Design a protein with these regions (language model features):
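A residue-level marker of the well-folded mature domains of exported/periplasmic proteins
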Residues: 4-325
Length: 325
C-alpha cells in the first residue's frame, strides 16, 4: 500500500463511459469526489477520455506516471487492465468499482445493484398492473434498457426481472441494449418502441442515454425508472422512482481512508440494501399517485431481502439464471 501525505500525491477519478454530465453514475461519483477532496484537503482531478474503453492501458499508465497517489476508476471494462497496471506501480493505490480485483494496492468496491433493482422491478409490475393509475395498461408488461450487454449491466436487469416475477410470475419484461451510455436520442427511440409495444414502465440502466428514456416516458404519459442518482426530478411525475447507487459515498469514503493512511488495499468493500449503498428513491413526485398497498408490499420485500428470506440472484457471482439465457 502506498503511504503518502495529501501534499505529496494528488488523486484522480477516472470517468467511465457516458462522461461527466450524465446526471447519473459519473456525476454522482464526481460529487462524492469533490466532497471528499474538500473534507480531506487532498488535491485531485477527474480524468476523461474520448474512448475510455479502448484506451484503458494508456489512461491508467499515463495517470500512474503522472504521479497520482490514488486512482479511482469508474469504468467497469478497466478491471483486468487495472490489475495488471497496479503490479507495475506498487507505490500507487488503485480502486476499481463494481468488480473484485486482487493486489495489495488495489481496493474493490461492490454494490448489490441486484437488490435495489429487484425492488424496482416489483414496484414497476405492481404499478403497471393497476389500470386505475393514469397511463398504466393494467397488464404486467414492463421494460428495461441497458447501456451495454455485459454482466455488470445484466446484474441490474436480472434483479429487475426477478422482482417483477415475484409480483407476477407471468410478468413480461422487455429487454434491450443501447450499446451507448451517452446518447439520449437512442434512449428515447428505444424507450418509445417499448412504450408503443405495451410496456407501462421502463427502467433505464444506461447512464446519459437513459435521459432519453425519461423523456420518452414523459412524452408517452408512462413511467420511467431512473438509476444511480435520484432522477425523479428530471421529469416530475413521470419517473416512478430511481434505483440509487451511492457511488458518492463510496468515493468519498475511499478518499477519507486514503488521506488517513488507511487505504483498504487488498480488500473488498460491499454496499447493498443493508449498508444503504443501494435503494429506491423517496418517490417525491409519484408517491401520492401510487396505492399505499403497493408501496407497503415493496417495503415488505425489502425487509425479506434484508432478513435473507428473499435471496436476490447475483449474475456476477452466480452466472445467469435459466430465465435469462
Amino acid at each position: 500500500m502506498a503511504v503518502a501525505t495529501a501534499a505529496e500525491k494528488p488523486v484522480a477519478l477516472i470517468i467511465s463511459q457516458g462522461g461527466l454530465g450524465d446526471q447519473s453514475y459519473n456525476d454522482l461519483a464526481y460529487a462524492g469526489f469533490k466532497k471528499g477532496l474538500a473534507e480531506t484537503k487532498l488535491v485531485g482531478k477527474p480524468v476523461e477520455s474520448k474512448d475510455v474503453v479502448a484506451q484503458a492501458a494508456d489512461i491508467l499508465r499515463r495517470a500512474s506516471d503522472a504521479g497520482f497517489g490514488l486512482l479511482i476508476d469508474l469504468e467497469y471494462s478497466h478491471g483486468d487492465t487495472l490489475q495488471t497496471v497496479a503490479k507495475d506501480y506498487p507505490d500507487t493505490d488503485y480502486v476499481i468499482l463494481n468488480q473484485i480485483k486482487s493486489g495489495k494496492n488495489v481496493a474493490s468496491v461492490l454494490f448489490q445493484e441486484q437488490e435495489g433493482s429487484f425492488l424496482a422491478g416489483a414496484l414497476a409490475t405492481l404499478v403497471a398492473k393497476d389500470a386505475s393509475i393514469k397511463g398504466m395498461s393494467g397488464k404486467p408488461v414492463i421494460g428495461v434498457i441497458g447501456g451495454t450487454k455485459s454482466v455488470g449491466i445484466d446484474k441490474f436487469i436480472v434483479g429487475y426481472i426477478q422482482g417483477a416475477r415475484a409480483v407476477d410470475p407471468k410478468a413480461e419484461v422487455k429487454v434491450a441494449y443501447s450499446n451507448n451510455f451517452g446518447d439520449p436520442a437512442i434512449g428515447l427511440q428505444m424507450a418509445k418502441a417499448m412504450f408503443d409495444g405495451g410496456a407501462s414502465v421502463v427502467y433505464q440502466v444506461a447512464g446519459g442515454t437513459g435521459l432519453g428514456v425519461i423523456q420518452a416516458a414523459k412524452q408517452a404519459g408512462k413511467f420511467a425508472i431512473g438509476v444511480d442518482t435520484d432522477q425523479d426530478g428530471l421529469a416530475p411525475g413521470f419517473v416512478l422512482t430511481s434505483m440509487i447507487k451511492r457511488t458518492d459515498v463510496a468515493v468519498e469514503t475511499v478518499l477519507k481512508d486514503y488521506a488517513d493512511n488507511k487505504f483498504p488495499g487488498g480488500q473488498t468493500v460491499t454496499l447493498g440494501l443493508k449498508q444503504d449503498g443501494v435503494g429506491l428513491s423517496p418517490m417525491t413526485y409519484t408517491k401520492d399517485k401510487i396505492p399505499a398497498a403497493d408501496i407497503a408490499e415493496v417495503e415488505d420485500m425489502k425487509k425479506k431481502i434484508l432478513s435473507g428470506e428473499i435471496k436476490v440472484w447475483n449474475a456476477v457471482d452466480q452466472g445467469y439464471p435459466d430465465y435469462f439465457k
